[in-house]
């Protein structure tokens, strides 16, 4: 077990407890993806130190990523002015993010707080991943239906190497209807592999400083070619 509680929400776990929680949360999350608490627990308990450290190092090697690690900005109701976002022009990242949240009737604070990470630097990496997941959907122009989620999970799995993302892509893909599974294999997967490989590292991007830009401009900065362009 960790020697001490490192932050307010921290729940130190003994190795056996971590393993059991990881297995249990994985089984539940795979069978019922709507269980956000189990998806979050699975993500944290399976995010082994070397994977998070690799993400941290990649962020540190990027000018913007290094600043993010230093300043540790958060994306929450307290830091995002949603009223201002709603007033932004159509097509901007901020307006699309606002529409995304409104459509799902959710908020930035709906993301579970990290609890099971035993390293303060890795804590921020995991929290940042969680808080920027919605921007990945927007940048890739992927819906929050099963096909869209699986496509995003494959992107994140390739870019970040997080076991939860890899597992979510594989098992989520297996749960798709035959038609959607074929669409994933024939169209989305080849595209998302190319995008994840060639795009800028999403974890080292300061999304909150680009709200007033058109999505097409943000995609250009990220080196993302929308799937619709290839159709």
From Swiss-Prot:
Component of a multi-subunit COQ enzyme complex. Zn(2+) binds at residues 133-134, 137, 149. Pathway: Cofactor biosynthesis; ubiquinone biosynthesis. It catalyses: a 4-hydroxy-3-methoxy-5-(all-trans-polyprenyl)benzoate + H(+) = a 2-methoxy-6-(all-trans-polyprenyl)phenol + CO2. This is Ubiquinone biosynthesis protein coq-4, mitochondrial. It is a peripheral membrane protein. GO terms for biological process: ubiquinone biosynthetic process. HAMAP family: Coq4. The keyword Membrane applies. This protein may be expected to contain an N-terminal transit peptide but none has been predicted. It comes from the Eukaryota. Keywords: Lyase, Membrane, Metal-binding, Mitochondrion, Mitochondrion inner membrane, Ubiquinone biosynthesis, Zinc. Its EC number is 4.1.1.130. InterPro entries: Coq4, Coq4_euk. Its cofactor is Zn(2+). Lyase that catalyzes the C1-decarboxylation of 4-hydroxy-3-methoxy-5-(all-trans-polyprenyl)benzoic acid into 2-methoxy-6-(all-trans-polyprenyl)phenol during ubiquinone biosynthesis. One of its GO terms (cellular component) is mitochondrion. It comes from Caenorhabditis elegans. The keyword Lyase applies.
